[in-house]
Amino acid sequence: MKLTQANYYSKEANSLYFSVSQFKDFMKCPAMAYAKLSGEYEEEYGRALLLGSYVDEMLTGTRKSQMKFLEENHSDLFKKNGEPYADVGQAIDTIERVRKQPLMMKYLSGKHQVIMTGEIEGVPFKIKMDSYKEGEYIADLKYLRDTRSPNLFQNVVDYWKYTWQGAVYREIVRQNTGETLPFYLVIATKEKPVHLAVVEINDFNLNEALDTVKKNIRRCQAIKEGKIEPERCEEHDCSYCAETVILKEPIDSDLLGMSTAQIKAMKGDI
């Protein structure tokens, strides 16, 4: 299957290829990831994703993809009188801030929405890069709530697994071109005032992240193919597990609100 802008996110493409997002899903909750692929579960995406997609399109999309996005999402972005909703207005201001930053625009000046495919441990992967400059860099645009991590023991790059994204993108580009390129994040926040940053993920972290992908991707593929039963994560922030849970017995009050990892640690399973 030849991937294009039109079919990149199609059910067939998602069935044939892993993406970084799909890998993250299987690592977080295999049952949720499997249900999404089979069509049994459709994740609800709020305005955060819509706004992120809007900023991404306006800064790295093609003219054709921008017009398509605006047409499909016009009523969610703009009021009946044509004025943008408040959060969209803030996103527009952020886009202008980014365009006035030479360093940010340097890393957003490559070829946009470049698709490549490859394999990791024999498993097909697909990537679509926000900004790719042959022989120089790979860059991805992020529109974040802020640059602080929800986890005190991880920085925001590690928390959101951007290292996995950088590692996979760099490896697939290497397979296609023979070049190992640096990976950058071009970051703008939703804060007032907006915080801006250009971040390079270092080689050590990218290599470590690629090792993580290599160690886990075959199991993820086996789950995807139905060869291994997909486990439920039962984490509090997993909408799929919350919506499909069947209670079997009371739990101890000390366990209420704890993460699965915390409960396993208490039981000595970790």
Predicted feature descriptions by range:
Residues 45, 168-270:
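Metal-dependent nuclease catalytic regions and adjoining charged, substrate-binding loops involved
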Residues 1-128, 233, 237, 248-260:
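Metal-dependent nuclease catalytic cores that hydrolyze phosphodiester bonds in DNA/RNA
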Residues 59-63, 143-146, 174, 221:
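Hydrophobic/aromatic-lined pockets within catalytic cores
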Residues 7, 14, 73, 81, ...:
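Detector for Asparagine
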Residues 107-211:
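Mg2+/Mn2+-dependent nuclease catalytic core
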